[in-house]
Amino acid sequence: MIVKICGLKKSVDVKAAVENGADMIGFVFAKSKRQVTIEQAHQLAKNIPPNIKKVGVFVNPTEDELTAAIKGVPLDIVQLHGQEPTEQADRTDAEVIKAFPVKEGKLPNNINDYSNAYILLDAPAEEYEGGSGKTFDWDKVNSDLLIKNKLIIAGGLNVENVKEAINRFEPYAVDISSGVETNGEKDPEKIKIFIKTAKGVGK
């Protein structure tokens, strides 16, 4: 199972993710309590080996903003959480994760328009896009409509429910942020336990 740890701001947290086998590490550039600058992400990325993909999280960025971050960090993947058009995703010089909020179990009508992107299902936004710590209604989602090897599950995951999420959706990856935090800060021990748990499913 591919595991993405998102919203990292400190070198100690990056170290915990790297040492415990994270496959993707996410930096949030959109407005958020976890927001970092390109320069901060660049410094943190120096401690990430090339086999771990660096992901930048954005909400309705301009193409110049995307390009600056892709080159400046540098990023392997951009994660788009707004109303970005398919054309922007197709033109981006990086892999793309397109995030969709799942409201009342309904998948957005345009979810399959992003044919070249990974599809991330998340809980509906609150003050900021993503990272709310809440799950969407798993029971109402027909994941058979989605391509499994492009599917990423996020939204309220933690060590207690990640096994059920993986068994239910059979996703390509799982994505966590607040579920590995204590009092709003990343917790290296929780990062370790979550990665071990997620990667242990089915073994």
From Swiss-Prot:
The keyword Acyltransferase does not apply. It holds the Pfam family PRAI. GO terms for molecular function: phosphoribosylanthranilate isomerase activity. CDD domains: PRAI. Keywords: Amino-acid biosynthesis, Aromatic amino acid biosynthesis, Isomerase, Tryptophan biosynthesis. Pathway: Amino-acid biosynthesis; L-tryptophan biosynthesis; L-tryptophan from chorismate: step 3/5. Its EC number is 5.3.1.24. It catalyses: N-(5-phospho-beta-D-ribosyl)anthranilate = 1-(2-carboxyphenylamino)-1-deoxy-D-ribulose 5-phosphate. GO terms for biological process: L-tryptophan biosynthetic process. Belongs to the TrpF family. This is N-(5'-phosphoribosyl)anthranilate isomerase. The gene is trpF.
